[in-house]
Design a protein with these regions (language model features):
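Fe-S-dependent hydro-lyases/dehydratases of central metabolism
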Residues: 1-421
Length: 421
């Protein structure tokens, strides 16, 4: 039986050959919680009568949504996770002392590895598929079950193969590729399916772009996004202290795919997702014609807050100023990224351009804090969702784009093509 990479990963974890559609109970390599979702898991864990974690080294709590605490309620919620982490002497607990957005911090720390089965109580846990792992989001009670047993049940997902061919033009990144996929198949086009990204264009995508690709698989309804390990992955992994030995899997030639999609990336312009769905994608040329004024630009999140995003933004912002009636907020995804950006002089460029640089946080993306939109305000954002009220008031609008578009638009005060700056 020919297998996809996803079927092979599950087969190894279950101990027998499995195929799409089968219900299996799988061992879990890494369980990830955050300050918002983990307290519910902890409550379920305690109510079960459990006294210890099945695999303390395979459980991480990353405090990233409202950290540092934005108010009393978030402070009390954070305290639940802190107390639990200290009580169980959790080795992988990350708060203000070593903070970052979970889906950037976990790969940076080497806590996720190729061939792993990873779950997290956050829908964008699919990000980690970029290193050749099966990674997906689950509910907090599902997380509690894995905390107690080290396992969870799955229906092995069928796979949609996405082949990217050609060489991307200037300022075309993983964000544009995934927005194009979502535009083509819709927000439910990959419902409970693995999106496997392949093709010769992958050779032009660095790991940051690959994380962006897999991060937004969920926005097409995907159970996961996954990219097989290649030389680019291996170079990235060589620079981190991996928690476990990587297990490399590759789809068999002739494996069964639910669908195969081919996209010629050489023909792509930067893609902008208009309100109020990530599938509402249009070309940057169309956005320029539409003359869309903006009140805020945001560069950050688990989708596009990595070092390459900051470098791209700095290259565009250097020697320029943010438009008078526009504000620019930049949120590095981890402290390590922020430190490297500082060493490279990027922070100076941002501040001199009139941007605000925040600590690592998910805050603005979910309309929590550090960039909330007011009534009728419009934002160009590198985040992953633009639903009604996603970043603030229900009458506000969010346009999703890559970091180059966001930076260039901040200077112009309206959505522009970064290739014209």
């Amino acid at each position: 039986m020919k297998q996809t990479i996803t079927e092979k990963i599950f087969s190894e974890h279950v101990g027998k050959k499995v195929s799409a559609g089968q219900i299996v109970e799988s061992n879990i390599d890494m369980v990830i919680g955050n300050d918002i979702t983990t307290p519910i898991s902890i409550k379920a864990f305690k109510e079960s009568g459990a006294k210890k974690l099945a695999n303390p080294n395979g459980f991480a709590i990353v405090m990233d949504h409202y950290i540092p605490a934005k108010d009393i309620m978030s402070a009390n919620q954070a305290k639940i996770s802190r107390d639990f982490a200290y009580e169980h002497d959790l080795p992988n607990f990350f708060d203000e002392k070593d903070m970052g957005i979970e889906h950037a911090l976990m790969p940076e720390k080497g806590l996720v590895a190729p061939g792993d089965v990873i779950i997290g109580a956050d829908s964008h846990t699919c990000t980690h598929g970029a290193i050749g792992a099966f990674s997906t989001g689950m509910g907090s009670t599902d997380l509690a079950y894995a905390m107690i047993t080290g396992k969870n049940w799955f229906k092995v997902p069928p796979t949609i193969k996405v082949e990217f061919i050609g060489k991307p033009a200037d300022h075309i990144y993983g964000k544009d590729l995934i927005l194009e996929v979502i535009r083509m198949i819709g927000v439910d086009g990959a419902l409970y399916k693995a999106l496997e990204f392949t093709g010769d264009a992958m050779a032009y995508l660095d790991m940051d772009s690959r994380f962006s690709l897999c991060n937004m698989a969920i926005e097409a309804g995907g159970k996961s996004g996954i990219i097989a390990v290649d030389d680019i992955t291996k170079e990235f992994l060589s620079k981190v202290n991996l928690r476990s030995e990587p297990k490399l899997h590759y789809s068999d030639e002739g494996a069964n795919y639910d669908q195969i999609i081919t996209i010629d990336v050489s023909k792509l312009e930067p893609v902008i997702a208009y309100p109020y769905l990530p599938s509402n994608g249009k070309s940057v040329s169309q956005a320029v014609k539409d003359d869309i004024k903006i009140d805020q630009a945001f560069i950050g999140s688990c989708t596009n807050g990595r070092l390459s995003d900051l470098r791209i933004a700095a290259q565009i912002l250097k020697g320029k100023r943010v438009a008078k009636h526009t504000r620019l907020i930049i949120t590095p995804a981890t402290q390590k990224i922020a430190l490297q950006a500082q060493k490279e002089g990027l922070m100076d460029i941002f501040v001199e351009a009139g941007a605000v640089v925040s600590n690592p946080t998910c805050g603005a993306c979910l309309g929590g804090y550090m960039g909330i939109l007011g009534a009728g305000e419009r934002c160009i954002s590198t985040t992953n969702r633009n639903f009604v009220g996603r970043m603030g008031d229900r009458t506000s609008e969010v346009y999703l784009a890559n970091s180059a578009v966001a930076a260039a638009s901040a200077i112009a005060g309206k959505i522009v093509d970064p290739r014209d700056i």
